[in-house]
């Protein structure tokens, strides 16, 4: 998968959050957008996922054969883990994973039980998500990002709400997807992207 952004900008009321964004992103590479809080990292990631429309410029998703994807279909090819994305709290963990698998398969045809083991939450598999701690919810979000069989993975502030053990778990697994997928991060914590090949400051897009 290839993502191309050309002269992309996003404006809220009278303020440009990012502007003049030009990117050429490829599967097999990892990219981290860095900058202080409020600098536009999350906005840029949301633009690239299609969650929010650009005020100017164009973003294209291209298959390996060069075919351009319609924006309505981008979601099939990406997964996003972010603090502002909510899990369905009325589901148990088992129900949530089974629901997710209806829309996006897991790698190696992993089952819900495999997922629960991967995120180290087997004892909580029948617990409602609403009763999970913030750290447990973050593990679930990251687990879905790591295991979903899609070409593009977005991670926004990936160690948010994780303790030291959870951060080590993240670092152990994020490196396993680098090289085989297109990995895009938003972060101001160097430990979150120490593996990353391409570091891009959002201050360049002002």
Where are these regions (language model features)?
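Catalytic Walker B motif of ABC-type/P-loop ATPase nucleotide-binding domains
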Residues: 153-157
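Hydrophobic anchor residue at the start of the ABC signature
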Residues: 142
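The feature captures the beta-strand-to-loop junction immediately N-terminal to the Walker
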Residues: 34-36
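Q-loop/switch helix immediately C-terminal to the Walker
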Residues: 84, 89-105
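Helix-to-loop junction immediately C-terminal to a conserved catalytic motif
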Residues: 49
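Conserved ABC transporter NBD signature motif
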Residues: 57-69, 73-74
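Conserved structural motif at the start of ABC-family nucleotide-binding domains
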Residues: 3, 18-20
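Conserved ABC ATPase "signature" region
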Residues: 109-125
């Amino acid at each position: 998968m290839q993502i191309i952004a050309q002269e992309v900008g996003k404006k809220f009321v009278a303020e440009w959050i990012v502007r003049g964004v030009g990117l050429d992103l490829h599967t097999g590479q990892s990219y981290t957008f860095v900058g202080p809080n409020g600098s536009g990292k999350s906005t840029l990631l949301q633009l690239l996922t299609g969650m929010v429309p650009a005020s100017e410029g164009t973003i294209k998703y291209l298959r390996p054969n060069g075919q351009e994807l319609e924006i309505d279909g981008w979601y099939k090819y990406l997964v996003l883990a972010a603090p502002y994305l909510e899990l369905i709290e009325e589901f148990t963990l088992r129900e949530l994973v089974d629901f997710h698998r209806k829309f996006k398969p897991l790698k190696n045809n992993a089952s819900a039980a495999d997922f629960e083991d991967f995120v180290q939450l087997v004892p909580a598999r029948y617990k409602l998500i609403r009763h999970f701690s913030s750290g447990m919810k973050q593990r679930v979000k990251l687990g879905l990002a790591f295991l979903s069989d899609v070409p593009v993975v977005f991670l926004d502030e990936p160690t948010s709400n994780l303790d030291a053990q959870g951060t080590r778990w993240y670092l152990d697994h994020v490196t396993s997807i680098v090289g085989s997928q297109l990995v895009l991060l938003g972060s101001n914590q160097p430990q979150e992207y120490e593996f990353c090949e391409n570091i891009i400051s959002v201050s360049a897009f002002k």
